Amino acid sequence: MSYRFLTVRAFGFTGFHCDATRLLSETEVIDVPSSLDFVGETELRLETAWPQCEENCYTILPRFNVQVDFEYYPVRVEIVCRVCAASLSVIFSKWDFYCSRRGHFVPVDQNGDLFRIGTLQETGEKYFYFCDKSICRQCIIQAAHHHS
């Protein structure tokens, strides 16, 4: 059983669906990101983890103006918890990266805070959350108990 709690809407990007057969629309909803990673400086990858060991990976490529020195166009990402309706809008720009080891870039929000990844103790399922006071984590745990 998978729990679809979080949705992601990204604006101002060009990207492909995980099967690379179609373009994502700019307002397409992407379910259940368990991690949100920048690869290098241009690529936003959303990974959705499923209990059946099936993974859906999405890549969002921020726009560049190739005519004028690869000018960067920021990407706005809105993450919404479907349970508690809390949301966070983040503007990713060329400088909004926290560089960790091995050249891996982790996105930071406008306050410089890293997005958080948690794990459900009952199932070991990883999930992505951003709410203050771990609101989304509690939503997921309560819903998991409700569905068990």
From Swiss-Prot:
Superkingdom? Viruses
Keywords noted in UniProt: Host-virus interaction, Inhibition of host innate immune response by virus, Suppressor of RNA silencing, Transport, Viral immunoevasion, Viral movement protein
GO terms in the biological process aspect are: symbiont-mediated suppression of host innate immune response; transport of virus in host, cell to cell
Give the function comment from the record. Answer: Transports viral genome to neighboring plant cells directly through plasmosdesmata, without any budding. The movement protein allows efficient cell to cell propagation, by bypassing the host cell wall barrier (Potential). Likely acts as a suppressor of RNA-mediated gene silencing, also known as post-transcriptional gene silencing (PTGS), a mechanism of plant viral defense that performs sequence-specific inhibition of viral mRNAs expression.
The name this protein goes by in its record: Movement protein P1
Species assigned in the record: Southern bean mosaic virus (isolate Bean/United States/Arkansas)
User: Which lineage ranks, top first, belong to the organism behind this chain?
Assistant: Viruses, Riboviria, Orthornavirae, Pisuviricota, Pisoniviricetes
